[in-house]
Amino acid sequence: MRENERIVIHRLGESFRDCTQIRRDSCAEPGPGEVLIRNHFAGVNGVYDQMMCLDKVEHTRVTPPAETGVEAIGIVEAVGDGVVSPNPGQSVVTVNVGQAYRYWQLCPAEDAIPVPQVAPEVLALIPSGVSALVALEQVGELTTGETVLITAAAGGLGNVMTQLAVAAGNHVIAVCGNADKAAWLASVGADRVINYRNESPGAVLASEYADSIDLAMDSVGGDVFDVLVDHLAPRG
C-alpha cells in the first residue's frame, strides 16, 4: 500500500500557510478507467492558492477539508481495467483541481496528457504556454514585424509571451519591476526593457512609442492599462 501526503485546506482565511496542513493516508489503487500517477512537480500559483483559502475562486466552491493544487507532471505507476493509454512508465501532465499538491493522484485516464519527459519546464508550458499562445495568436492575431508591448513580462505568463513575440520576429517592449528581471528579458531578446521602478512606462511610451504599439498584452490593469491604450497605434 502506497502512503500519500497531500496539502489540504482545513479552514478558510487569508494565509495559505495557516489555512493548510499536510495529511498522510494510504493511496487507493486505480479503478476501471483510472490511472495512478506519482507527481514529480506541481505548478504553484500563489494568487489562486490565496483565493482558494478565501473561497473566492468563481468556478470552485471551497468547503474544508479541501484538496489543493491544479497542474502537475509525473509518471504513471499503475492503470485500472480498460485503460489503453497512457501506459505505466509514461510521463504525463494533469490539470485537475485538488490533485497537484500531493505525492500520488488518481484520475481518469483521459485526463492524463502524455508528454516527452518529466521536467518543470514542460509543466510550465501547459497553463502558461497555452494561455500565452491563445492570447497572442487567437486574441491578439500576432503576425511579424509588429511592435508588441507586454507587462509583467518576466512573470509566469509574461515570460512565455515575450519569448513567443520575439521568436515571431516582432519588436518587443517588456515591462518589469527589477534589475534581475530586466537583464533576463534583455537576454531573451526583448528590444526595449522598461523597469518601472527606474522609468515611467508612460513617459517612455510617449517619447519613444507614441501611438505606435500594435499589440499590448497587459496582466496588470488599472492605470497601466490606460497608459497602454493611450499609445496604441491606429487599429492596434
Please provide the spans of the model-predicted regions.
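A structural motif shared across PLP-dependent enzymes of the aminotransferase-like
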Residues: 96-109
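Mid-domain Rossmann-like dinucleotide-binding core that forms the NAD(H)/NADP(H) cofactor-binding site
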Residues: 87, 122-199
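A glycine-/small-residue-rich N-terminal strand-loop-strand element
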Residues: 52, 73-97
